[in-house]
Design a protein with these regions (language model features):
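Polyanion-binding surface elements
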Residues: 1-29, 56-63
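A short, Lys/Arg-enriched interface patch at domain edges and termini
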Residues: 53-84
Length: 84
């Protein structure tokens, strides 16, 4: 049996609804390394976020993980993108 990762891409309105953040706060958190950046879906302006990455960060926040560890988690998630 092979392990297959089911990847779901969410667009900005879905991710904003998942996080409960306003757009400006959302982009600030990406710049600060507290949320993963989007991936390109074709054209330069078409982007989306990998759902399991957002869910992992939200779970870490709910668990009370310190910000420095959340930044490390986000970096690990970004680094794992090359393994798909």
């Amino acid at each position: 049996m092979t392990n297959t990762v089911q990847i779901k891409i969410n667009r900005k309105p879905e991710v904003l609804a998942m996080t409960g953040l306003k757009k400006s706060t959302f982009y600030t958190r990406i710049k600060e390394g507290l949320l993963p950046p989007p991936i390109q879906l074709g054209s330069e302006r078409t982007v989306g976020w990998i759902e399991h990455e957002i869910q992992a960060v939200l779970a870490a926040m709910c668990a009370g993980m310190p910000l420095i560890q959340i930044k490390e988690l986000v970096q690990d998630l970004i680094n794992q993108r090359t393994k798909f």
